[in-house]
Amino acid sequence: MDSTFSGIEIGKRSLFAHKDAMNTVGHNLSNATKPGYSRQRVTMKTEIPLYAPQLNRAKKQGQLGQGIVVQSIDRVKDELLNTRIIEESHRLGYWTSQDKFISILEDVYNEPEDQSIRKRLNDFWESWHDLANQPQGLAERKIILERGKSFCEGIRNRFHSLERIYIMANDEIKITTDEANNYIRNIANLNKQISKSQAMKDNPNDLMDARDLMVEKLGNIISVSIENKQDPNEFLIHAEGRHLVQGSIANEFKLEATNGPTRTRWNILWANNDKAYLKTGKLGSLLNIRDEEIKNEINELNNIAANIIEIVNEIHEAGRGMDKKNGRSFFSQELKLTDDRGRYDTNGNGQFDSVHIFKINSTNEIFPEEKLGFYGTLKFEATNSNEIVEIPYNAPDTVQDVINRINNSNAQVTARINSEGKLEIKAVKEQEDENITFKIKHIEDSGSFLTKYTGILNASGPEGAYDYKNIDTTDKLAPKSTYSISPLKNPAAWIKVADIIDSDPSKIASGIKNPTNEISIGDNQAALRISSFGNSQIMIGKNLTLNDYFANTASNIAIKGQISEITKESQSQILKDLTDLRMSISGVNKDEELANMIEFQQAFIAASKFITVSVELIDTVINKMGV
């Protein structure tokens, strides 16, 4: 029922309600520049009036109002828009990181023209051409030595530059994973606090803002989805179908240190120790950069180093220096297999288990336009696969037709006719675990092309096949065929001119031994063959020439850089538009808040005056009516 003091109670309620509203305005203005803050507003409701419709109600006119109270303090938030921003954040995180590291990779290739690897290599071939014109010249040999050392230095410098970028990406993976775990822990902790606050029927707006901001930052690192049920303990964050957060439970990522191609490699694991193959967000980008982009660049550099070492040494070992001796390599053969049949202990158990042969040269001289006159099927293992590639040949086919089919297939070998007119089968680079390998895996011929015609294999069919898993597989090769053993690991890191050549340039070969094992004065065949490699079809992987290789390498990284830059800018604009839209809804408008402050201030003053009048009425009743 109403009373003499009901006026004071109504005024008090208004006073407190508008004071809370003014405090909320002040809170909004104080946090106007804080990232992630959502504008708050006070929702007021009219207090339940007198009298309730019941039998014992007072016999007077009603209902009589009881003033106003604060119902809730709410965030102004568009949850659907917020979810959209979180969904878009991982794309910006991915392409920002991608653009950063691709730009760093581009800087490695943006060498001064006169210091580029391509220029150094061209100068190296040119110096061999000069020696071919003056095969007895010591000065020409000294120039070859210096240019060879310069080329090796360029290869090693690029390798170490790529290695440093690999280490940067690897370190950033660890840092970013720790950052993600920090967000996951904090979100779970905030869920616990929010749950307690909501249990008291409060709206923990600032805690929820802090949680939303952390979820958004986590969404930049990895693509996440949110499931916010009515039960606050069931605020879920999913990533790649896994629970990262469930209420106050945090399932953090784990880091596992393994051996990488150059240094320690960090693997990301889920909470249950399964390996996390992340494809989105900043972490997905870093994994792609480290395990694909940088590793591919290192592998390509190893590819060119291994091939140039091989083709130059093959001719140089057959040639003779000024002392008329042969059998000397121009480039160092460090880190090669010690077994002369290419047998290798892969498992480290003390027993050979595979054969690593890089290149095989046939016994017989062949001619590209010669028709075969017979038919059969070649079988090779596919690149980075255990599948078999079959390449048929028929009687009307020429030798070059068969070579083209091999090179245009997915076989993990290439073929060409070398400078001696013999068929050369060479392995292309493959990725095994964390390292690049150069080894021929399988060669088989149902007919006579690789047996009687070229002289690579002893016999046709499966029983005559070369297979690297058979440690005696070199017995399957024709007796007079020759082969080269594979480099073990990162030839680009250790490539250098052999010490014996470095100490005495006169040992650089210019001529080729003849059938009488003598060398003729003025013989320039070794120098001439090596100088021709600059424009010859020597097959660096699937590239025909060195020029093709350099052109493809440079264009590939340039295209990737352009794509990453454009996509990052596009994604950044999309996220900016969404963020601007969110700010127009949830952001603090200072003019609007100041207008609200004046409104609430006037209401507060009115309430205080009403209380003053109510007190005067009570004073009249008590002191002036003689009661």
From Swiss-Prot:
Localisation: Secreted; Bacterial flagellum
Keywords, in A-Z order: Bacterial flagellum, Secreted
Pfam families from the UniProt entry: Flagellin_IN, Flg_bbr_C, FlgK_D1
Gene Ontology terms: biological process: bacterial-type flagellum assembly
Any one Gene Ontology cellular component term annotated for this protein: extracellular region
Gene Ontology terms for molecular function: structural molecule activity
Main localization, broad class: secreted
Similarity-based family: Belongs to the flagella basal body rod proteins family.
Record protein name field: Flagellar hook-associated protein 1
Organism annotation: Borreliella burgdorferi (strain ATCC 35210 / DSM 4680 / CIP 102532 / B31)
